[in-house]
Amino acid sequence: MTKTTTCVYHFLVLNWYIFLNYHIPQIGRNEEKLREFHDGGRSKYLTLLNLLLQAIFFGVACLDDVLKRVIGRKDIKFVTSFRDLLFTTMAFPISTFVFLVFWTLFHYDRSLVYPKGLDDFFPAWVNHAMHTSIFPFSLFETILRPHNYPSKKLGLTLLGAFNFAYIIRILWRYVQTGNWVYPVFDSLSPLGIIIFFSAAYILVAGIYLFGEKINHWKWGAIAKPQMKKN
């Protein structure tokens, strides 16, 4: 894709995610059956957090595209570095994780993650917008342009910090209300929940490393700026 086409693509995807972030929280806002869905805000659902994260990433990517055309590549290194860090450590791993875990649980027993009653309020296209299209958008981004990956230590630490923060959010929600964010946790013992959270981090860390492999396969080694010695 040309630079102009890439810029237009990022702009269109950004607007798609802006629309989803506005539209989905409005669905069934006054419906009693969806009170639990709306109570507590979007931060309790990884799916909705991911949509917000994707909007932020594509916003930064769009800004990076525009600034490169206006003031040049060398003058916006911070924006480009932030774009790459955001994509490699969060946007790609988390969107892929949501896609894989949701559809695995959905096909095993949808009541564990997306009860059938939600179909009365969320059309199929909304479900796929939240849980399906997020993956091809992220995968396409990996082959659209090279991304400079941080060190594995830094990348996995940042990903782990996000994972830990979200676990705290889930547990805090349970302490406050006595209800789990996702029905799957109702069927697990305390040990099972610990194993689930541990397996989730192992999976998302594996996705991070897989994304790094794809980046290397498509673009080869990307030289990192050398740190100046004092």
Swiss-Prot record:
Organism superkingdom: Eukaryota
Keyword ATP-binding: no
Bilayer topology term: Multi-pass membrane protein
Cytoplasmic face of the membrane: 1-7, 67-85, 142-154, 212-230
InterPro entries in the record: ADTRP_AIG1
Cellular location(s): Cell membrane
Alphabetical list of Pfam families matching this protein: Far-17a_AIG1 (PF04750)
PANTHER family documented for this protein: ANDROGEN-DEPENDENT TFPI-REGULATING PROTEIN, ANDROGEN-INDUCED PROTEIN 1-RELATED
Job description of the protein: Hydrolyzes bioactive fatty-acid esters of hydroxy-fatty acids (FAHFAs), but not other major classes of lipids. Shows a preference for FAHFAs with branching distal from the carboxylate head group of the lipids. Regulates the expression and the cell-associated anticoagulant activity of the inhibitor TFPI in endothelial cells (in vitro).
Identification of the protein by name: Androgen-dependent TFPI-regulating protein
Organism per entry: Mus musculus (Mouse)
Species classification: Eukaryota, Metazoa, Chordata, Craniata, Vertebrata
Gene, per the UniProt record: Adtrp
